């Protein structure tokens, strides 16, 4: 049986190996692919920052994950992505699917997937990954509004991101926005996906609101 300490030690070992590999981009912003939106944001979203992605309701959780993963892909052209996932997400929505991740544009070989039962463990793993200079993006998924995820915890993530150059994306489901150190905050819901030529379901589509 793997203990919390063993799991965290294994993650530290993985991160240490990554630090001997490719370095993330040093550009201060990453484009969202929409010139109008990039312009409104001053050139795109900032790297080395904490950004929050909220599902409009639990039913829109998979869309929030998909949008956050799309941001991670935009932010991280080549460096590893560390995805720290609370097990509640697997129970409610199923496990990440490698072929689907690849179809979205992320090579699964660049993905380090960490699962944790409790929000506290998600935060510990995300903070450890955010301190690793070889990581491009950390995607942390937390269910609900646990007490451990307070303003202080978000500040720790934000400071770690600023120091290392890592972009941190916190996906929240079944949670209301609260005080945090996030640079931006998004609310996501599913949108109708339709191929204009065939009328059949097409690429993933999201309805997104920038809250902050």
Language model segments and positions:
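Conserved inter-motif catalytic segment of the P-loop NTP-binding fold
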Residues: 79-136
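Detector for small/aliphatic-rich hydrophobic stretches
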Residues: 1-82, 94, 100-109
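Phosphate-binding/switch region of NTP-binding enzymes
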Residues: 170-212
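Short acidic, S/G/P-rich loop/turn micro-motifs used as interaction or catalytic elements
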Residues: 57-60, 88-90, 119, 144-149
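Hydrophobic/aromatic ligand-binding patch that stacks against planar heteroaromatic rings
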Residues: 74, 129, 160
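A contiguous pocket-lining binding segment that forms or flanks enzyme active sites
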Residues: 134-179
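Conserved beta-strand segments of the P-loop GTPase G domain that flank and frequently precede/overlap
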Residues: 54, 84-85, 113-116, 139-143, ...
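Helical mechanochemical/support elements of P-loop NTPase systems and associated helical scaffolds
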Residues: 33, 64, 93, 122, ...
């Amino acid at each position: 049986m793997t203990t919390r300490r063993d799991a965290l030690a294994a993650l530290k070992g993985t991160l240490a190996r990554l630090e001997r590999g490719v370095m993330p981009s040093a550009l201060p912003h990453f484009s969202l692919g929409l010139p109008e939106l990039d312009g409104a944001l001053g050139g795109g979203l900032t790297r080395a920052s904490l950004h929050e992605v909220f599902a409009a309701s639990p039913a829109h959780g998979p869309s929030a994950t998909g949008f956050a993963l799309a941001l991670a892909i935009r932010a991280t052209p080549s460096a590893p992505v560390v995805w720290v996932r609370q097990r509640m997400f697997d129970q409610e929505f199923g496990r990440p699917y490698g072929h689907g991740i690849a179809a979205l544009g992320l090579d699964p070989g660049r993905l380090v997937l960490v699962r944790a039962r409790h929000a506290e463990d998600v935060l510990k793993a995300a903070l450890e990954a955010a301190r690793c200079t070889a990581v491009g993006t950390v995607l942390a998924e937390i269910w609900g509004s646990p007490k451990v995820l307070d303003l202080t915890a978000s500040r720790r993530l934000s400071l770690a991101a600023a120091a290392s150059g890592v972009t941190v994306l916190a996906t929240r489901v079944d949670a209301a926005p609260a005080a945090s150190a996030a640079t931006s905050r998004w609310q996501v819901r599913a949108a109708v996906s339709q191929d204009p030529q065939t009328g059949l379901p097409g690429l993933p589509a999201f309805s997104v609101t920038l809250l902050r």
